[in-house]
Amino acid sequence: MQVILLDKVANLGSLGDQVNVKAGYARNFLVPQGKAVPATKKNVEFFEARRAELEAKLADVLAAANARAEAINALGTVTIASKSGDEGKLFGSIGTRDIADAVTAAGVDVAKSEVRMPNGVLRTTGEHEVDFQVHSEVFAKLVVNVVAE
């Protein structure tokens, strides 16, 4: 199925690209989320008329993401208190939701889906570096300090 992308989609293309995707991917994901429209003649003409407007909107979203990434980087460190045993092992773990809540409480709105933890959840006390993917092109880093309660 041919679609016109209205947003940058990872591993697929950027704004304005006409790509061929499976019908289910287009029907169930791209179109409902507003990331693409079917590539009919009418939609192609409509898109070409609105191209500048969509590019400006995409640039605004990118600028907002850069501002949020700078705010996350400016925080430097966030401290989370959790119950732990004698040797620094936590009872339970600290996951993406806990980190997102702590950063939001510190003053920067972050969704749990933006937190990237390649090594899995945090299970020990100490300082851990956590990545944030605020936008498909914008990343931020933050140190999470886990302390015993």
Curated annotation (Swiss-Prot):
Its name, as the record gives it, is Large ribosomal subunit protein bL9
What does the organism's lineage look like at the top? Bacteria, Pseudomonadati, Pseudomonadota, Gammaproteobacteria, Enterobacterales
- Choose any GO biological process term that the UniProt entry carries and state it: translation
Cystines in this chain: none
What family is this? Belongs to the bacterial ribosomal protein bL9 family.
Q: Which InterPro entries match?
A: Ribosomal_bL9, Ribosomal_bL9/RNase_H1_N, Ribosomal_bL9_bac/chp, Ribosomal_bL9_C, Ribosomal_bL9_C_sf, Ribosomal_bL9_N, Ribosomal_bL9_N_sf
* Function noted in UniProt: Binds to the 23S rRNA.
PROSITE patterns membership? RIBOSOMAL_L9
Q: Which UniProt keywords apply?
A: Ribonucleoprotein, Ribosomal protein, RNA-binding, rRNA-binding
Species of the source: Enterobacter sp. (strain 638)
Give Gene Ontology CC terms.
ribonucleoprotein complex; ribosome
A GO molecular-function descriptor: rRNA binding
